[in-house]
Amino acid sequence: MTLFPRFATRRSPLASLALAVTLAVSLTACSDDGGGSSSDGEAAENENSENENSENQNSAEGDFPVTISSDAGEFTLQEPPERIVSLSPSATEILFAIGAGEQVVAVDEQSTYPEEAPVTDLSGFEPNVEAVTGYEPDLVVISNDANDLVASLTELDIPVLVNPAPADIESGYAGMAELGIATGHVDETAEEISRIRSEVESALEEGPQEPVRVYHEIDDTFYSASSNGFIGSVYAELGATNIADEADTDGTGFPQLTEEAVIEADPELIVITDQVGYTPQDVAQRPGWDEVTAVQEDNVVTVDADLASRWGPRLPQFVSTAAEAMSQAAGVPAG
């Protein structure tokens, strides 16, 4: 399933940021629903619309206070946060890319990029409330609510922004816009989204002009990345035929296949990451896999796990890597 056709018309970067802001956040300008006569209602609607446009513009310029609505609920930031704790590697990369790095006081143990990120032993998978609050944060950014962290921090009046894994590239831009508003770096975020979008579009042109059957293996139990998730959406943008799509009946983006199903689907490209603990040679030596085209044509490749799984400033590198691998599998030069 192709989520975004390669040659679809795309919005300008600034227009996309505006759309992303609309999708990602609810600002204080949102008006309440109400009754009234037709004429009174129309007048009120016009007045509310004018107020909303004015306040949205102020928020887009980085003015505070702003009210953010995320998966953690709604909260208001009276001023730009100065002590951010990030428990999401993707959010960490984005925060530094949009100029909010100096506001970050601690990041989780998996946030290994960029080098200047203040890495700690904080866990994003099993967060400890006491450990997090020890950094006296005025904003905590997470990708999912592990250990009911949101409720625990909310009780302590610490705002939590849940910046979840996007379903595709476009919603990844929305997540970036959300962080830009929350930190007061809207202009920098617009510039970063523009850069990423431009480089992604250039990388997409490196891909083959014909479909390639792709299998992205998460681990040796045959979990894979379908087109319903962020990783798979990159292959979809490149026009791939993702062999995991049929198995993703619940739309999670990460279905589990059977070994027999993989062999029968005969992928032309198999992608594993450098964190799975085995090599392309190990994949090729699996019983029966010598029948798979990707194995026969030596198109089992390893990619950087961080690049493949993190949405943010390094997305163009993953798109370029995927495009090159797909072009090789298609037997045509990249680009």
Language model feature labels by segment:
Residues 128-142, 158, 258-272:
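Proline-aspartate-enriched helix->loop->beta-strand connector
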Residues 83-135, 139-145, 243:
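A short, structured surface patch at a secondary-structure boundary
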Residues 88-89, 144-145, 165, 218-220, ...:
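Short secondary-structure boundary segments
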Residues 148, 163-179, 211-234, 278-279:
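Extracytoplasmic ligand-binding site segments that recognize negatively charged/polar headgroups
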Residues 110-112, 228-254:
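Alpha-helical, coiled-coil/dimerization segments enriched in small aliphatic residues
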Residues 2-90, 186-215, 324-335:
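Bacterial Sec-exported substrate-binding components of ABC uptake systems
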Residues 148, 171, 175-177, 190, ...:
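Structured C-terminal subdomain patch of bacterial secreted/periplasmic proteins
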Residues 70-72, 120-130, 248-259:
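Short helix-initiation/N-cap motifs at beta->coil->alpha
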